[in-house]
Amino acid sequence: MELSVAMCGLLCLLFSQAVPMCVPTDYTLYEERRECDFCVAINTTICMGFCYSRDSNMKELAGPRFLIQRGCTYDQVEYRTVILPGCPLHANPLFTYPVALSCHCGTCNTDSDECAHKASSGDGARCSKPLRHIYHTLA
C-alpha cells in the first residue's frame, strides 16, 4: 500500500512538470489618479503560471530549434470599465482594465499585451489616498 502511494506521488510530481500550469488567477489592481480623491482596488483575473521554455547557451551551434521562449499569456480577454469615485468634473473618471477569461502558453503579443514584468517596490504601500474597493462580476 505504501509503495503504491509513493509511486502515485512520484508520478504526479513528474507529470506536473510536463503539464503547463498557466491559468487565470485572482489579482488586485490599484489605480490612483492625482486629480481624484481615492485610490481604487479592483479585483480581476490575470494569466499566471508556468510554461515550458528552453534556451541553449550555444545558440550559434544549436540553431533556433533549441530556443523556445513561451510565457503565460491571454487566450481570451475581456476589457471592463469602471467609474473611479471622487474625481472632479474636469477629470476623466473612466478606467479600463483586462479580465483574463482563459490563458495559454505562447509568445506575448506586444501589440495588445503588456509583456514586461514590472517589479513592485516591496514596501507594501499601494496607495497614498483612502482606498475604495471595486469588485467585478462575470457576466
Swiss-Prot record:
Q: What is the recorded name of this protein?
A: Thyrotropin subunit beta
According to its UniProt entry, the function of this protein is described as: Indispensable for the control of thyroid structure and metabolism. May play some role in the biological processes of the immature fishes.
Q: Main localisation, per the record? A: secreted
Q: Quick one: signal sequence residues? A: 1-20
Give a GO biological-process term: G protein-coupled receptor signaling pathway
How is the quaternary structure described? Heterodimer of a common alpha chain and a unique beta chain which confers biological specificity to thyrotropin, lutropin, follitropin and gonadotropin.
Keywords on record = Disulfide bond, Glycoprotein, Hormone, Secreted, Signal
Q: Which GO terms describe its molecular function?
A: hormone activity
- Flavoprotein found in the keyword field: no
Q: Name one Pfam family in it.
A: Cys_knot
What superkingdom does the record give?
A: Eukaryota
SMART domains (alphabetical): GHB
Gene Ontology cellular component annotations, sorted alphabetically: cytoplasm; extracellular space
* Cell location: Secreted
What is the disulfide pattern of this chain?
Answer: C22-C72, C36-C87, C39-C127, C47-C103, C51-C105, C108-C115
Note the InterPro entries from the entry: Cystine-knot_cytokine, Glyco_hormone_CN, Gonadotropin_bsu, Gonadotropin_bsu_CS
